[in-house]
UniProtKB/Swiss-Prot annotation:
Reactions this protein catalyses: [protein]-peptidylproline (omega=180) = [protein]-peptidylproline (omega=0)
Residue ranges, annotated region (Disordered): 92-148, 168-239
Compositionally biased tracts (Basic and acidic residues): 168-184
Gene name per UniProt: fkbp4
Localization annotation: Nucleus
SUPFAM superfamilies (alphabetical): FKBP-like
Activity regulation (UniProt): Inhibited by both FK506 and rapamycin.
EC number: 5.2.1.8
Compositional bias annotation for Acidic residues: 94-148
Entry protein name: FK506-binding protein 4
PANTHER family per UniProt: 39 KDA FK506-BINDING NUCLEAR PROTEIN (PTHR43811:SF19), FKBP-TYPE PEPTIDYL-PROLYL CIS-TRANS ISOMERASE FKPA (PTHR43811)
Organism per entry: Dictyostelium discoideum
Protein backbone atom coordinates (compact mmCIF):
# COMPACT_ATOMS: atom_id res chain seq x y z
CA UNK A 1 0.00 0.00 0.00
CA UNK A 2 1.47 3.38 -1.07
CA UNK A 3 2.41 5.98 1.56
CA UNK A 4 3.55 9.59 1.18
CA UNK A 5 3.97 12.76 3.24
CA UNK A 6 5.42 16.32 2.94
CA UNK A 7 7.87 17.47 5.63
CA UNK A 8 8.96 21.06 6.35
CA UNK A 9 10.54 22.88 9.29
CA UNK A 10 7.53 22.10 11.46
CA UNK A 11 8.00 18.59 12.94
CA UNK A 12 5.41 16.03 11.87
CA UNK A 13 4.58 13.17 14.24
CA UNK A 14 3.23 9.96 12.76
CA UNK A 15 2.34 6.51 14.13
CA UNK A 16 2.19 3.88 11.33
CA UNK A 17 -0.66 1.36 11.49
CA UNK A 18 1.52 -1.20 9.70
CA UNK A 19 5.23 -1.73 9.21
CA UNK A 20 6.41 1.20 7.05
CA UNK A 21 9.13 1.03 4.37
CA UNK A 22 10.39 4.46 3.17
CA UNK A 23 12.11 4.32 -0.23
CA UNK A 24 12.45 7.87 -1.62
CA UNK A 25 13.07 11.45 -0.49
CA UNK A 26 13.01 14.39 -2.92
CA UNK A 27 12.63 18.17 -2.89
CA UNK A 28 9.16 19.57 -3.46
CA UNK A 29 8.31 20.79 -6.95
CA UNK A 30 7.94 24.36 -5.61
CA UNK A 31 11.34 24.40 -3.86
CA UNK A 32 13.20 27.70 -4.40
CA UNK A 33 15.88 28.01 -1.71
CA UNK A 34 19.32 26.84 -2.86
CA UNK A 35 20.57 26.06 0.63
CA UNK A 36 21.06 22.62 2.13
CA UNK A 37 18.01 20.76 3.45
CA UNK A 38 18.61 17.90 5.92
CA UNK A 39 15.83 15.37 6.49
CA UNK A 40 15.75 14.30 10.15
CA UNK A 41 13.80 11.62 12.00
CA UNK A 42 13.23 11.21 15.74
CA UNK A 43 12.75 7.58 16.69
CA UNK A 44 12.92 5.94 20.14
CA UNK A 45 13.94 9.27 21.65
CA UNK A 46 16.93 9.82 19.33
CA UNK A 47 17.25 12.11 16.30
CA UNK A 48 18.90 10.85 13.08
CA UNK A 49 19.70 12.46 9.71
CA UNK A 50 18.40 10.42 6.77
CA UNK A 51 19.70 12.48 3.81
CA UNK A 52 20.79 15.93 2.64
CA UNK A 53 19.18 17.54 -0.44
CA UNK A 54 20.10 20.70 -2.35
CA UNK A 55 18.30 22.47 -5.20
CA UNK A 56 19.99 22.09 -8.63
CA UNK A 57 22.47 19.63 -7.11
CA UNK A 58 21.06 16.66 -5.21
CA UNK A 59 17.28 16.85 -5.41
CA UNK A 60 16.53 13.14 -4.93
CA UNK A 61 17.74 10.37 -2.62
CA UNK A 62 16.96 6.63 -2.51
CA UNK A 63 16.22 5.35 1.00
CA UNK A 64 15.78 1.89 2.46
CA UNK A 65 14.36 2.59 5.93
CA UNK A 66 11.80 0.52 7.86
CA UNK A 67 9.67 1.55 10.86
CA UNK A 68 7.64 -0.81 13.04
CA UNK A 69 3.90 -0.46 13.31
CA UNK A 70 2.56 1.31 16.42
CA UNK A 71 5.81 3.19 17.16
CA UNK A 72 5.69 6.98 16.91
CA UNK A 73 7.95 8.63 14.34
CA UNK A 74 8.70 12.36 14.10
CA UNK A 75 10.00 13.88 10.83
CA UNK A 76 11.44 17.39 10.36
CA UNK A 77 13.55 19.38 7.88
CA UNK A 78 16.55 21.51 8.72
CA UNK A 79 16.31 24.01 5.86
CA UNK A 80 13.87 26.28 4.00
CA UNK A 81 12.44 23.80 1.46
CA UNK A 82 9.79 21.10 1.76
CA UNK A 83 10.82 17.45 1.31
CA UNK A 84 8.44 14.77 0.00
CA UNK A 85 8.76 11.28 1.48
CA UNK A 86 7.31 8.21 -0.29
CA UNK A 87 7.19 4.52 0.53
CA UNK A 88 4.67 1.78 1.28
CA UNK A 89 3.14 -0.20 4.11
CA UNK A 90 4.32 -3.78 4.58
CA UNK A 91 1.51 -6.16 5.55
CA UNK A 92 2.83 -8.66 8.13
CA UNK A 93 0.49 -11.37 6.84
CA UNK A 94 1.82 -10.85 3.33
CA UNK A 95 5.36 -10.94 4.66
CA UNK A 96 4.78 -14.33 6.33
CA UNK A 97 3.28 -15.76 3.16
CA UNK A 98 6.14 -14.42 1.15
CA UNK A 99 8.62 -15.92 3.57
CA UNK A 100 6.92 -19.29 3.12
CA UNK A 101 6.99 -18.85 -0.61
CA UNK A 102 10.71 -18.07 -0.44
CA UNK A 103 11.31 -21.29 1.49
CA UNK A 104 9.28 -23.25 -1.06
CA UNK A 105 11.19 -21.56 -3.85
CA UNK A 106 14.47 -22.44 -2.17
CA UNK A 107 13.41 -26.10 -1.92
CA UNK A 108 12.31 -26.10 -5.55
CA UNK A 109 15.54 -24.41 -6.59
CA UNK A 110 17.48 -27.07 -4.64
CA UNK A 111 15.64 -29.86 -6.45
CA UNK A 112 16.08 -28.10 -9.78
CA UNK A 113 19.78 -27.62 -8.99
CA UNK A 114 20.15 -31.37 -8.36
CA UNK A 115 18.35 -32.12 -11.62
CA UNK A 116 20.58 -29.66 -13.45
CA UNK A 117 23.66 -31.28 -11.90
CA UNK A 118 22.47 -34.71 -13.06
CA UNK A 119 21.72 -33.31 -16.51
CA UNK A 120 25.12 -31.61 -16.54
CA UNK A 121 26.83 -34.91 -15.66
CA UNK A 122 24.90 -36.69 -18.43
CA UNK A 123 25.86 -33.94 -20.87
CA UNK A 124 29.51 -34.20 -19.80
CA UNK A 125 29.40 -37.97 -20.36
CA UNK A 126 27.77 -37.46 -23.76
CA UNK A 127 30.41 -34.90 -24.69
CA UNK A 128 33.17 -37.28 -23.57
CA UNK A 129 31.62 -40.07 -25.66
CA UNK A 130 31.39 -37.71 -28.64
CA UNK A 131 35.02 -36.65 -28.16
CA UNK A 132 36.10 -40.30 -28.00
CA UNK A 133 34.08 -41.05 -31.15
CA UNK A 134 35.67 -38.07 -32.91
CA UNK A 135 39.12 -39.26 -31.83
CA UNK A 136 38.34 -42.79 -33.05
CA UNK A 137 37.12 -41.40 -36.38
CA UNK A 138 40.24 -39.27 -36.72
CA UNK A 139 42.42 -42.29 -35.92
CA UNK A 140 40.49 -44.35 -38.48
CA UNK A 141 40.93 -41.56 -41.06
CA UNK A 142 44.65 -41.39 -40.28
CA UNK A 143 44.92 -45.18 -40.59
CA UNK A 144 43.07 -45.07 -43.93
CA UNK A 145 45.41 -42.30 -45.15
CA UNK A 146 48.42 -44.34 -44.01
CA UNK A 147 47.08 -47.42 -45.82
CA UNK A 148 46.46 -45.39 -48.99
CA UNK A 149 49.96 -43.90 -48.85
CA UNK A 150 51.47 -47.33 -48.21
CA UNK A 151 49.51 -48.80 -51.16
CA UNK A 152 50.72 -45.96 -53.42
CA UNK A 153 54.29 -46.47 -52.27
CA UNK A 154 53.98 -50.22 -52.89
CA UNK A 155 52.61 -49.64 -56.41
CA UNK A 156 55.34 -47.11 -57.15
CA UNK A 157 57.98 -49.52 -55.89
CA UNK A 158 56.55 -52.37 -58.00
CA UNK A 159 56.53 -50.17 -61.11
CA UNK A 160 60.12 -49.07 -60.44
CA UNK A 161 61.23 -52.67 -59.94
CA UNK A 162 59.45 -53.78 -63.13
CA UNK A 163 61.07 -50.99 -65.14
CA UNK A 164 64.44 -51.76 -63.62
CA UNK A 165 64.02 -55.46 -64.47
CA UNK A 166 62.96 -54.53 -68.02
CA UNK A 167 66.03 -52.32 -68.42
CA UNK A 168 68.29 -55.08 -67.10
CA UNK A 169 66.66 -57.58 -69.48
CA UNK A 170 67.19 -55.23 -72.44
CA UNK A 171 70.81 -54.78 -71.46
CA UNK A 172 71.30 -58.54 -71.20
CA UNK A 173 69.78 -59.06 -74.66
CA UNK A 174 72.08 -56.46 -76.20
CA UNK A 175 75.07 -57.97 -74.45
CA UNK A 176 74.17 -61.51 -75.63
CA UNK A 177 74.02 -60.56 -79.36
CA UNK A 178 77.78 -59.94 -79.82
CA UNK A 179 78.55 -63.20 -78.04
CA UNK A 180 76.43 -65.14 -80.56
CA UNK A 181 78.35 -63.48 -83.45
CA UNK A 182 81.74 -64.30 -81.94
CA UNK A 183 82.03 -67.61 -83.91
CA UNK A 184 82.48 -65.42 -87.00
CA UNK A 185 85.90 -64.56 -85.65
CA UNK A 186 87.06 -68.17 -86.23
CA UNK A 187 89.25 -68.30 -89.35
CA UNK A 188 88.73 -71.21 -91.71
CA UNK A 189 91.93 -73.23 -92.27
CA UNK A 190 94.06 -73.03 -95.38
CA UNK A 191 92.79 -69.50 -96.26
CA UNK A 192 95.01 -66.57 -97.04
CA UNK A 193 95.66 -64.17 -94.29
CA UNK A 194 94.16 -61.37 -96.39
CA UNK A 195 90.75 -63.00 -96.30
CA UNK A 196 91.06 -63.53 -92.60
CA UNK A 197 91.16 -59.79 -92.18
CA UNK A 198 87.49 -59.47 -93.20
CA UNK A 199 86.08 -61.15 -90.14
CA UNK A 200 88.06 -58.77 -88.01
CA UNK A 201 86.36 -55.88 -89.72
CA UNK A 202 83.04 -57.49 -89.07
CA UNK A 203 83.89 -57.91 -85.47
CA UNK A 204 84.84 -54.28 -85.13
CA UNK A 205 81.53 -53.18 -86.59
CA UNK A 206 79.60 -55.45 -84.30
CA UNK A 207 81.51 -54.25 -81.30
CA UNK A 208 80.74 -50.66 -82.17
CA UNK A 209 77.05 -51.46 -82.46
CA UNK A 210 77.06 -53.23 -79.16
CA UNK A 211 78.72 -50.33 -77.43
CA UNK A 212 76.40 -47.71 -78.91
CA UNK A 213 73.02 -49.45 -78.69
CA UNK A 214 72.90 -49.89 -74.90
CA UNK A 215 73.09 -46.12 -74.48
CA UNK A 216 69.80 -45.73 -76.37
CA UNK A 217 68.06 -48.15 -74.01
CA UNK A 218 68.98 -46.10 -70.96
CA UNK A 219 66.43 -43.37 -71.84
CA UNK A 220 63.35 -45.35 -70.62
CA UNK A 221 64.68 -44.96 -67.09
CA UNK A 222 63.26 -41.38 -66.92
CA UNK A 223 59.59 -42.38 -66.28
CA UNK A 224 60.66 -44.05 -63.03
CA UNK A 225 60.78 -40.61 -61.35
CA UNK A 226 57.19 -39.61 -62.31
CA UNK A 227 55.21 -41.99 -60.03
CA UNK A 228 56.50 -40.07 -57.00
CA UNK A 229 53.78 -37.39 -57.54
CA UNK A 230 50.88 -39.38 -55.93
CA UNK A 231 52.08 -38.19 -52.51
CA UNK A 232 50.22 -34.86 -53.13
CA UNK A 233 46.86 -36.08 -51.66
CA UNK A 234 48.29 -35.21 -48.24
CA UNK A 235 47.23 -31.53 -48.90
CA UNK A 236 43.59 -31.99 -47.65
CA UNK A 237 44.90 -31.11 -44.17
CA UNK A 238 44.47 -27.37 -44.99
CA UNK A 239 40.65 -27.29 -44.51
CA UNK A 240 41.14 -28.95 -41.12
CA UNK A 241 43.53 -26.18 -40.04
CA UNK A 242 41.01 -23.56 -41.22
CA UNK A 243 38.28 -25.24 -39.21
CA UNK A 244 40.47 -25.20 -36.10
CA UNK A 245 41.13 -21.48 -36.56
CA UNK A 246 37.41 -20.78 -36.90
CA UNK A 247 36.69 -22.55 -33.61
CA UNK A 248 39.15 -20.28 -31.80
CA UNK A 249 37.17 -17.11 -32.66
CA UNK A 250 35.85 -15.64 -29.38
CA UNK A 251 32.17 -14.94 -28.90
CA UNK A 252 30.99 -12.08 -26.76
CA UNK A 253 28.11 -12.58 -24.27
CA UNK A 254 27.71 -8.89 -23.35
CA UNK A 255 24.39 -7.36 -24.49
CA UNK A 256 24.14 -3.60 -25.07
CA UNK A 257 20.63 -2.08 -24.95
CA UNK A 258 19.59 1.11 -26.84
CA UNK A 259 19.48 2.95 -23.50
CA UNK A 260 23.23 2.37 -23.10
CA UNK A 261 22.89 -0.25 -20.35
CA UNK A 262 25.04 -3.35 -20.76
CA UNK A 263 24.47 -6.72 -19.12
CA UNK A 264 26.14 -10.12 -19.10
CA UNK A 265 24.34 -13.25 -17.84
CA UNK A 266 26.70 -15.10 -15.50
CA UNK A 267 24.03 -17.70 -14.61
CA UNK A 268 20.71 -18.01 -16.47
CA UNK A 269 17.86 -18.57 -14.01
CA UNK A 270 15.12 -21.15 -14.45
CA UNK A 271 12.42 -19.59 -12.26
CA UNK A 272 9.69 -17.02 -13.04
CA UNK A 273 10.38 -13.52 -14.36
CA UNK A 274 9.45 -10.32 -12.46
CA UNK A 275 6.23 -8.45 -13.25
CA UNK A 276 5.96 -4.66 -13.25
CA UNK A 277 4.78 -3.31 -9.91
CA UNK A 278 5.50 -6.58 -8.07
CA UNK A 279 8.06 -6.95 -5.31
CA UNK A 280 11.38 -8.67 -6.06
CA UNK A 281 14.28 -9.68 -3.82
CA UNK A 282 17.89 -9.41 -4.96
CA UNK A 283 21.36 -9.91 -3.54
CA UNK A 284 23.95 -7.58 -5.02
CA UNK A 285 27.34 -5.94 -4.81
CA UNK A 286 27.97 -2.51 -6.36
CA UNK A 287 31.35 -1.31 -7.60
CA UNK A 288 32.82 1.68 -9.40
CA UNK A 289 34.76 1.22 -12.62
CA UNK A 290 38.01 1.37 -10.60
CA UNK A 291 36.92 -1.76 -8.69
CA UNK A 292 36.02 0.01 -5.43
CA UNK A 293 32.93 -1.43 -3.69
CA UNK A 294 30.45 1.27 -2.61
CA UNK A 295 27.46 -0.87 -1.55
CA UNK A 296 26.39 -4.52 -1.12
CA UNK A 297 23.64 -6.76 0.24
CA UNK A 298 24.80 -10.38 0.07
CA UNK A 299 23.26 -11.90 3.21
CA UNK A 300 19.76 -10.39 3.32
CA UNK A 301 18.03 -9.80 -0.05
CA UNK A 302 17.16 -6.20 -0.88
CA UNK A 303 13.47 -5.92 -1.84
CA UNK A 304 11.74 -3.34 -4.05
CA UNK A 305 8.84 -3.06 -6.47
CA UNK A 306 10.12 -3.25 -10.02
CA UNK A 307 9.19 -0.80 -12.74
CA UNK A 308 7.83 2.03 -10.54
CA UNK A 309 11.06 3.97 -10.01
CA UNK A 310 11.71 2.86 -6.43
CA UNK A 311 15.31 2.26 -7.54
CA UNK A 312 17.58 3.69 -10.23
CA UNK A 313 16.43 3.16 -13.82
CA UNK A 314 19.36 0.86 -14.56
CA UNK A 315 18.01 -1.64 -12.04
CA UNK A 316 14.41 -1.42 -13.31
CA UNK A 317 15.65 -2.16 -16.84
CA UNK A 318 18.37 -4.69 -16.03
CA UNK A 319 16.45 -6.86 -13.54
CA UNK A 320 13.16 -6.93 -15.50
CA UNK A 321 14.37 -9.55 -18.00
CA UNK A 322 16.00 -11.86 -15.42
CA UNK A 323 14.59 -15.10 -14.00
CA UNK A 324 14.68 -16.30 -10.40
CA UNK A 325 18.00 -18.05 -9.76
CA UNK A 326 19.81 -15.99 -12.40
CA UNK A 327 22.96 -13.94 -11.86
CA UNK A 328 23.74 -10.93 -14.05
CA UNK A 329 26.42 -8.24 -14.28
CA UNK A 330 24.94 -4.79 -15.01
CA UNK A 331 27.09 -1.94 -16.34
CA UNK A 332 24.92 1.15 -15.79
CA UNK A 333 25.85 4.53 -17.32
CA UNK A 334 25.50 7.67 -15.21
CA UNK A 335 22.26 8.85 -16.86
CA UNK A 336 20.57 5.60 -15.72
CA UNK A 337 22.09 5.84 -12.21
CA UNK A 338 22.79 9.00 -10.16
CA UNK A 339 23.61 11.35 -13.06
CA UNK A 340 25.65 14.51 -12.73
CA UNK A 341 25.12 14.87 -8.99
CA UNK A 342 26.21 11.34 -7.97
CA UNK A 343 25.59 10.18 -4.41
CA UNK A 344 28.40 11.66 -2.28
CA UNK A 345 30.59 10.63 -0.68
CA UNK A 346 30.62 7.05 -2.04
CA UNK A 347 29.47 7.69 -5.64
CA UNK A 348 31.09 10.59 -7.56
CA UNK A 349 29.27 12.65 -10.24
CA UNK A 350 28.79 11.11 -13.70
CA UNK A 351 29.85 7.69 -12.37
CA UNK A 352 29.32 4.47 -14.32
CA UNK A 353 28.27 1.73 -11.88
CA UNK A 354 28.82 -2.03 -12.06
CA UNK A 355 26.44 -4.33 -10.18
CA UNK A 356 26.61 -8.12 -9.80
CA UNK A 357 22.94 -8.98 -9.14
CA UNK A 358 21.29 -12.30 -8.17
CA UNK A 359 17.48 -12.51 -8.42
CA UNK A 360 16.37 -14.67 -5.47
CA UNK A 361 12.59 -14.05 -5.40
CA UNK A 362 9.73 -12.31 -7.17
CA UNK A 363 6.05 -12.01 -6.30
CA UNK A 364 3.57 -13.18 -8.94
Amino acid sequence: MFWGIEISKVPVKFTPAFDLHITTACLSAVAKDTGRNVLQVKYDGKTYSLCSLKLNATEHSVLDTNFEEGKEVEFSVSGNNTICLTGYFVDSMFGDDEHGEDEDNEEEEGEEGEDEEMEGEDEDEDEEDEDEEDEDEEEEDDEEDDEINKELERQILEQALKRKAQIEADKNKQQKKPKQEEPVKQVTPVKPTAQAAKPTAATTTTTTTTTTTPTKQTTPAKPAAKPVTPTKPVTPTKPVEAAVVEKKKPTSSVVTLPSGLQYEDLVVGSGPSPKSGKKVGVKYIGKLTNGKTFDSSLRTPFTFRIGIREVIRGWDIGVASMKVGGKRRLTIPADLAYGRSGAPPSIPPNATLIFDVELVSCAQ
